[in-house]
Amino acid sequence: MTPLMEQYANIKKQYADEVLFFRLGDFYEMFNEDAVEVSRLLNLTLTHRADCPMCGVPYHASKIYIARLLRLGKKIAICEQVGEISPGGG
């Protein structure tokens, strides 16, 4: 598991009942079961990275997607990025 995914997993443990919007650059990414559910609910493209389901929304449009999920009864947790993303994804 990459350092980035370790960080995601640790944060997701704290917010297991929420959809975790995980900021990476100009996007909020969702992974694993969150990605599968959100892609279905919002009709987003579900992709995979190293067998990990993922989907994302642009930061500048995130309020629209978050509002839609809240209207559907979902709880949201937002994790902002601090610092730069390393080339190795960590």
Outline where the language-model segments fall:
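Basic, polar low-complexity surface loops/patches
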Residues: 1-90
